[in-house]
């Protein structure tokens, strides 16, 4: 895995093939903006293909796991059909990539 390609996710390898993934926006309670949302959607295919990882654990930096979607992102998307459609596809990818991992 190329951990350096991710800006809002941190990675830590632990013993026995455990990969700890930390969502790293503690100032926003790890709410997913466009950047994090995209990273979360694509990371699972890489985790699944990584021969060093047997299990992945996801957590949040700071005091919260995640506040969910960043409301500023939602406001930016309002009225933009193409952005909303892209985000909905990405949301589907995120869920199915986790399931397939």
Regions found by a protein language model. Give the residues of each.
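Glycine- (often His-adjacent) and acidic-residue-rich active-site loop
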Residues: 3, 60-97
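PAS-family sensory domains
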Residues: 100-101
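Conserved CoA-thioester-binding segment of acyl-CoA-metabolizing enzymes
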Residues: 1-61, 82, 96
């Amino acid at each position: 895995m190329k951990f350096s390609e991710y800006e809002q996710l941190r990675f830590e390898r632990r013993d026995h093939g455990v990969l700890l993934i930390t969502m790293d926006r503690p100032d926003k309670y790890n709410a997913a903006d466009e950047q994090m949302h995209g990273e979360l959607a694509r990371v699972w295919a890489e985790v699944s293909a990584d021969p060093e990882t047997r299990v992945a654990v996801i957590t949040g930096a700071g005091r919260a796991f995640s506040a969910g979607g960043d409301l500023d992102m939602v406001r930016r998307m309002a009225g933009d059909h193409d952005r909303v459609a892209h985000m909905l596809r990405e949301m589907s990818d995120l869920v199915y990539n986790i399931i397939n991992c």
